[in-house]
From Swiss-Prot:
Protein family (similarity comment): Belongs to the EPSP synthase family. MurA subfamily.
Organism: Chlorobium limicola (strain DSM 245 / NBRC 103803 / 6330)
Pathway annotation from the record: Cell wall biogenesis; peptidoglycan biosynthesis
Binding sites annotated in the UniProt record for UDP-N-acetyl-alpha-D-glucosamine: R93, R122, P123, I124, D125, L126, D307, V329
Protein name: UDP-N-acetylglucosamine 1-carboxyvinyltransferase
Keyword Isomerase applies: no
One matching Pfam family: EPSP_synthase
GO molecular-function terms, A-Z: UDP-N-acetylglucosamine 1-carboxyvinyltransferase activity
Annotated gene: murA
Compartment list: Cytoplasm
Length: 424
């Protein structure tokens, strides 16, 4: 198993390019299952464990794939299996994304109940509700979801989500594009990753109105075609890299981004005293001498993203005063806090809110990753901690960050990846 060994206290300076978004790559790859014609060429796909796992899943279904230099080619003409097995699905919750495309194209699908991140309940009820609205009959037995379209074809319908859900919106979209008639999705997620999926589906021939809004109108078509597509940047990775600059007192430029998609995060960095400069394709952050405590409340886009909440918590350990961290998306997403406190932070959880007292001088020690963003949070803390910090179980980090230690080292960090035995 791998760990990251971080020698802290180094100011980060320089420029780095953002990777493609994992959170948009996965539904886009799933959407290739909607077409049996031609070969897809997908650019700017990050080289991550989750991408590898998802590619294995669609290969199991019969797709043919090739991956090189962040370009993935996919041919789905030979897809025959409609069963997504437990052995693959257990590794990541996003495997549920194959449900909508398989059901739309073939009229049925069987998917193991998913695994994935370790924080709080993340029910798939909204995914199943959307499929039922479109005319699918759902059964759950022996750990598997089986969905069958009545008369073999989904029917357009109105889908009113009670809460915003990126995953359920994506699945509903992919199912609706081949359904007969019109589908209206209200309270749809408006995240940039859903907007990217809409653009990808439209390039394939789907008819979608309302892209980028919370109401999507889809007129079903009979077939879709393979296309070439360039993925969007990873706004969470970009935000994490900017946080690394801020926590170390550095100045970093992140290239290959769309600043508008990080507006809520940049606003909070500015409140914390950072100087932000933007061009159409880059963001530069210069850290202040003293960080100002800044509260955040994580909510669906365009508000502050839940996937930046843990990183912000680490940053606020260095601010002079009290900060309050609230997560309205995943109320229990605080697994990183005990580990931050092991490093010397002073953070209390009160009624689903983290209260951060700073500044605190952090001291390196061994800490344990529990999920993807908690891992990133601990790396940020290690960058500013005195001495050596060892972040264990970085396989969580590898699920969502492409060569993160190489990028940070290029900015002046001192991080090495080493093997270790779990309980030695």
């Amino acid at each position: 198993m791998d760990k990251l060994v971080i020698r802290g206290g180094r100011r980060l300076i320089g420029s780095v390019t953002a990777s493609g978004s994992k959170n948009s790559s996965l539904p886009v790859i799933a959407a290739t299952l909607l077409s049996g014609n031609g070969t897809f060429t997908l650019h700017r796909i990050p080289d991550l464990q989750d991408i590898s796992t998802f590619t294995q899943l669609i290969n199991h279904l019969g797709a043919q794939t090739s991956f090189s230099d962040n370009t993935l080619t996919v041919s789905t003409g030979n897809v025959e299996s409609l069963l997504a097995p437990y052995e693959l699905v257990k590794k990541m919750r996003a495997s549920i994304y194959v449900l909508g495309p398989l059901l739309a194209r073939f009229g049925e699908a069987t998917v193991s109940l998913p695994g994935g991140c370790a924080f709080g309940p993340r029910p798939i009820d909204l995914h199943l509700m959307a499929m039922e609205k479109l005319g699918a009959e759902i059964t759950i037995e022996t750990g598997f979801i089986t969905a069958k379209a009545r008369n073999g074809k989904l029917q357009g319908a109105r889908i009113d989500f009670p809460v915003s859900s990126v995953g359920a919106t994506g699945n509903a979209l992919m199912a609706a594009v081949l359904a007969e008639g019109k589908t209206i999705i209200t309270n749809a997620a408006a995240e940039p990753e859903i907007e990217a999926l809409c653009r990808f589906l439209a390039s394939m021939g789907a008819r979608i109105e309302g892209t980028g809004t919370t109401e999507l109108i889809i007129e079903g078509v009979t077939s879709l075609s393979a296309v070439e597509f360039t993925n969007v940047f990873d706004r969470i990775e970009a935000g994490t890299l900017l946080a690394a600059a801020a926590i170390t007192g550095g100045t970093v430029t992140v290239d290959g981004v769309e600043p508008e998609q990080l507006k809520s995060v940049l606003k909070k960095f500015a409140h914390a005293g950072c100087t932000i400069s933007q061009t159409p394709g880059s963001i530069t952050l210069a850290s202040p001498e003293k960080l100002i405590p800044t509260d955040i409340t994580a909510k669906p886009y365009p508000s502050f993203p839940t996937d930046m909440q843990a990183q912000w918590t680490a940053l606020m350990t260095q601010a002079e005063g009290t900060s309050r961290i609230t997560d309205k998306v995943y109320h229990e997403r605080f697994n990183h806090i005990p580990e931050l406190n092991r490093l010397g932070a002073h953070i209390e959880i009160r009624k689903n809110q983290a209260i951060v007292e700073g500044p605190r001088r952090l001291s390196g020690t061994k800490v344990m990753s529990t999920d993807l963003r908690a891992s990133a949070c601990l790396v940020l803390a290690g960058l500013v901690a005195d001495g050596v910090t060892e972040v264990l179980r970085v396989y969580h980090l590898d699920r969502g960050y492409e060569q993160i230690e190489m990028k940070l080292n290029s900015l002046g960090a001192d991080i090495t990846r080493e093997k270790y035995k779990e309980f030695s």
